[in-house]
Amino acid sequence: MNQYLIVSFQAVVLFPIVVAVFTLPYIAYNYHKYGSILSLKVLIVYSFIFYLLCMYCLVILPLPSPEKAATLHSHKMQLEPFLFIKDIIKKAHVIPSEPKTWLTIVLNKAFLVNILNLFLAVPFGMYLRYYFKKSFSHTFILSLLLSLFFEITQLTGLYFIYSGSYRLFDVDDLIVNTLGGILGYAIVGPLMIILPSRDELDEVSYKRGMEISLFRRVVSFFFDMAFISIITILSRPLMHQFHILRAFEIVTLSYFSVLPILTKGSTLGNFITSTAIVSTKGGHPKFFAYFLRYFLFFGVYFYLPIYIRQALEKFILINTDASKDMGYATIELLVALLYFLFLLLTTIKAALHRSLFYERWSRTKIESTVQVQ
């Protein structure tokens, strides 16, 4: 039991790393297809990932020590089907006239190991039927393939990292794990009466995807800035006469001003999140509206505080009266506070799906392009 606790703890430690790798593609997929991220779907998907990770750790770990690994030179296989039944009977020590000995059937190691293998795959079948909407035949095949993946991994010594298998390839494990997946498929059937169906979850996602959430804006902007950074690096030889920050500014302004004209209102970030820039009067904005929109956006949110800061510093340098230092510091603090309140107000308005100042002045807005399937 202690070994299982250690392995489970290792899965908990690895989970954040797996989540970090998986999250960005998952967010991109959901926003592109549904236009939103539903918390219940996130819970289901991430619990499925955590389950698979625990399953992997339980089957693969612990790895052999270096001393043990040095002795591994063969690939062991047990190919007799249902041998586990013979093992259970052999270790049961049942005396028909003594009912208490019947418990040895379920309390011996051979039985417990196979029960663990059975229940290990039960959630897999449940997830496949409920969330992924797989049929019985698909669940059977996928459960078999999952078990086969683990057995081959063990047989090959983590795909020949080790010179031999450190665990036994057992055909009974294939049988029991596959039965576990089928059992999970059967168990979740009655529960689907009370659980929201996958179609219902998708319907809610599509409905929410018609609105432009603050997080959706942030995700779109994140992808855009990532692409801009890549373009800046790749185009650096063509703009070597400019400072790297100036080159970044040129690429940024060109990206947000020209690309939407060519794509009828979409940047790469918009495409990923299934959004587009449209005119507040309907249709496509005038060509200069894209430039105005992002000139105002970057000018107010990024450059204005820098210029204000520089102006205050120049003013303080000109007026070197030490007795007024506290007053200058107070002015700086008040300006910073006002700017913070402005950002806070803007964030609240975006969260409430209100039009922002640069959208009103450029007569543009962000609109969802999600197609309900």
Predicted regions and their residues:
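Bulky hydrophobic segments
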Residues: 1-165, 182-273, 279-373
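Individual transmembrane alpha-helices with interfacial aromatic-anchor signatures
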Residues: 168-179, 330
